[in-house]
């Protein structure tokens, strides 16, 4: 079967790899000059199935009000003038109940755990290297309230049989030796030994090369103007004056997926702006050995070979990609507070990207009401974590195979309802 994939981020490239491995003739189209040059370029570098959780959580609405008055707040909101933003925030608010949080987190963990299994198999099969480490992740708590609040996440981890360790301040140094100097600032930590880290952009670039070796064609620097429709199906992709035709089409355009399919269906994928800095290591003993997540500032600090990546925060501001100096200041403050002297933040590169987020946190993977159109988008801050599993799942669906995990609650159909024979958004 001929399959066209729109988007060459980590999710699009993973989809291409698994589809090619299943025997399909795959073409990837992207406007950029190469793979992983937008959202996948400089993310936090974590592969964290155990920390797969929705931003829509109990207590977040009240926290959001408090964060409005804090200098280093992890969340910021600025109205972009669209009705869609207001609808999306309202639906996110509705998902902040304990019941919905539990459902959303459980299915996110399901996909993320499966994706890690797929990644491990990929690594065993191909030997792909991407500055990866398998030292686990460590969530750091600065207050007793944060530590107590982790109970709901631990319950989900237990139910999903995800290994974890609850560490006291004195035990943190066993996972991250450099934290011994700052343990007095912390009340404890939640460590997930099965999580991994690495450079997502490097991973995506090398996975694209593996996909090419399987026959995948990559068409970069190519405009993607729209979908040609005939007889209720997709008849091709309009790329300038050319129409690229296939048997099946996959939209993996991240935050841009919503507008791209708007004439066919409404999907609630909104850009969640994040930031990162990447600093050279200057003192090995003072640097992290794996990755930590600062629960207070929602910032991840990740070790690469000779670099430290610091990433996080969320701004609900539309498609604005302005680099804000105040956000860099927050990232530098966080890493220098926990790992003082480990990296030279004065020489750090500064980046921003738009994560494609759904209001319930779960990505949209699978079939759509259009028989030959598939979606693989909405992974939020967990694009790399979920990429291999999402790609394999999509390849199974397109190939007519039963996926290895439950997939019906991952598709766009959870957001759509039929009204008078037409598809309408259930969230409107």
Swiss-Prot record:
FAD binds at residues 3-17. GO terms for molecular function: D-amino-acid dehydrogenase activity. Its cofactor is FAD. Its EC number is 1.4.99.-. SUPFAM superfamilies: FAD-linked reductases, C-terminal domain, FAD/NAD(P)-binding domain. Coiled coil: none annotated. Signal peptide: none annotated. The keyword Flavoprotein applies. Oxidative deamination of D-amino acids. This is D-amino acid dehydrogenase. It comes from Burkholderia multivorans (strain ATCC 17616 / 249).
């Amino acid at each position: 079967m001929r399959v066209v994939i729109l988007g060459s981020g980590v999710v699009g490239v993973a989809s291409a790899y698994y589809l090619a491995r299943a025997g399909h003739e795959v073409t990837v189209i992207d406007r950029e000059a190469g793979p992983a040059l937008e959202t996948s370029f400089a993310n936090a570098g974590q592969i964290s199935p155990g920390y797969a959780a929705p931003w829509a959580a109990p207590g977040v609405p009240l926290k959001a009000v408090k964060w409005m008055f804090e200098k280093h707040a992890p969340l910021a909101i600025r109205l972009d003038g669209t009705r869609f933003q207001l609808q999306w925030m309202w639906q996110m608010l509705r998902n902040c109940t304990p019941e919905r949080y539990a459902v959303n987190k459980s299915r996110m963990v399901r996909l993320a755990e499966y994706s890690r299994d797929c990644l491990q198999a990929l690594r065993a099969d191909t030997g792909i290297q991407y500055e990866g480490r398998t030292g686990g992740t460590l969530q750091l708590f600065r207050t007793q309230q944060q530590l107590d609040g982790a109970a709901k996440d631990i319950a989900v981890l237990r139910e999903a049989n995800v290994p974890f360790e609850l560490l006291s301040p004195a035990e943190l140094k066993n996972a991250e030796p450099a934290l011994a100097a700052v343990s007095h600032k912390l009340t404890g930590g939640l460590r997930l030994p099965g999580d991994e880290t690495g450079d997502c952009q490097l991973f995506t670039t090398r996975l694209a090369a593996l996909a090419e070796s399987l026959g995948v064609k990559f068409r970069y620097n190519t405009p993607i103007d729209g979908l040609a429709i005939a007889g209720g199906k997709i008849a091709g992709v309009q790329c300038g004056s050319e129409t690229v035709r296939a048997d099946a089409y996959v939209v993996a355009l991240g935050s841009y997926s919503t507008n791209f399919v708007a004439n066919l269906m409404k999907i609630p994928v909104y850009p969640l702006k994040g930031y990162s800095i990447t600093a050279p290591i200057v003192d090995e003993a003072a640097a992290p050995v794996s990755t930590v997540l600062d629960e207070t500032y929602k910032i991840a600090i990740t070790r690469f070979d000779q670099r430290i990546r610091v990433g996080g925060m969320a701004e609900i501001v539309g498609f604005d990609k302005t680099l804000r100096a105040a956000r860099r200041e927050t990232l530098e403050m966080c890493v220098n507070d926990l790992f003082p002297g480990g990296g030279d933040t004065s020489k750090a590169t500064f980046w921003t990207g738009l994560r494609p987020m759904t209001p319930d946190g779960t990505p949209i993977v699978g079939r759509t009401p259009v028989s030959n159109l598939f979606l693989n988008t909405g992974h939020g801050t967990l694009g790399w974590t979920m990429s291999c599993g999402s790609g394999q799942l999509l390849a199974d669906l397109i190939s007519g195979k039963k996926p290895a995990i439950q997939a019906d609650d991952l598709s766009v159909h959870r957001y759509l309802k039929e009204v008078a024979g037409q598809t309408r958004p259930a969230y409107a």
